[in-house]
């Protein structure tokens, strides 16, 4: 993990033995088999989006388990893959178009660089084994990231899609931050509350009202 302004708050909050256990878990799992994202991208979300620049937090579950797809950013998918994109990112693009934003590619790096923390609750996944690392090591870390963002004074938007992410609402101070909850953008649930929820325009309205610059979701 590269040193960022997330580093010290995390070390202050987590148990003293957490990071040695985390390093042991990473070393062991990456030696035993194919695990995604690449090891140097595990913490890419907090490396690309410092706490001081974080305006929006989108919570995902875990990385894509297919080779070459996971980038260390929730929902983001390499632009080099033009076909067979995950249905969730396709539905996110549909909602963007409905809200007047045009984003043709599925790489969300530019969002992260604007202050959108794309945080998976579980940061690694074995090949073709979705959610297999849930409950292993990551949740104490990612829950604390959410709490640190919530405790920060600058108003933020927390976007929680689906039952898994919505459970994180209890970690957030809703009196100063905007919490946007909706169905997950997967095909199973997108038509039951994700489409038409307008998370991107609502986010920008809140940011502008709180004196911050909006996100260019088209990037």
From Swiss-Prot:
Keywords noted in UniProt: Cytoplasm, DNA damage, DNA repair, Hydrolase
Active-site feature positions: 62 (proton acceptor)
InterPro entries according to UniProt: UDG_fam1, Ura-DNA_Glyclase_AS, Uracil-DNA_glycosylase-like, Uracil-DNA_glycosylase-like_sf
Endoplasmic reticulum among keywords: no
Known role: Excises uracil residues from the DNA which can arise as a result of misincorporation of dUMP residues by DNA polymerase or due to deamination of cytosine.
Gene: ung
The UniProt record lists the keyword Cytoplasm: yes
PROSITE patterns found in the cross-reference section: U_DNA_GLYCOSYLASE
EC code(s) of this entry: 3.2.2.27
SMART domains: UDG (SM00986), UreE_C (SM00987)
Name by which UniProt lists this protein: Uracil-DNA glycosylase
UniProt cross-references to Gene3D superfamilies, sorted A to Z: Uracil-DNA glycosylase-like domain
GO (cellular component) term, any one: cytoplasm
Record field: catalytic activity: Hydrolyzes single-stranded DNA or mismatched double-stranded DNA and polynucleotides, releasing free uracil
UniProt GO BP: base-excision repair, AP site formation via deaminated base removal
GO molecular function: uracil DNA N-glycosylase activity
SUPFAM superfamilies reported in the protein's UniProt record: Uracil-DNA glycosylase-like
Main localization of the protein described in the UniProt heading: cytoplasm
Localisation: Cytoplasm
Recorded family membership: Belongs to the uracil-DNA glycosylase (UDG) superfamily. UNG family.
């Amino acid at each position: 993990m590269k040193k960022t302004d997330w580093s010290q708050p995390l070390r202050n909050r987590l148990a003293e033995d957490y990071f040695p256990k985390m390093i042991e878990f990473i070393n062991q799992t990456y030696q035993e088999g194919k695990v995604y994202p690449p090891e140097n991208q595990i913490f890419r979300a907090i490396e690309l989006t410092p706490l001081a620049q974080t305006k929006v937090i989108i919570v995902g579950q875990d990385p894509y388990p297919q080779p070459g797809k996971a980038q260390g950013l929730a929902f983001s998918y390499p632009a080099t893959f033009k076909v067979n994109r995950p249905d969730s990112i396709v539905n996110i693009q549909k909602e963007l178009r409905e809200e007047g934003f045009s984003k043709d590619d599925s790489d969300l790096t530019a969002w992260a660089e604007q202050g959108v923390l794309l945080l998976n609750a579980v940061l690694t996944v074995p090949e073709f084994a979705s959610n297999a690392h849930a409950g292993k090591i990551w949740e104490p870390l990612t829950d604390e990231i959410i709490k640190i963002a919530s405790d920060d004074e600058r108003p933020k938007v927390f976007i929680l899609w689906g039952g898994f992410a919505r459970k994180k609402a209890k970690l957030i101070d809703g009196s100063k931050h905007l919490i946007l909850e909706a169905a997950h953008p997967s095909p199973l649930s997108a038509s039951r509350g994700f489409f038409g929820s307008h998370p991107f325009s609502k986010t920008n309205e809140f940011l502008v009202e709180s004196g911050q610059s909006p996100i260019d979701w088209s990037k």
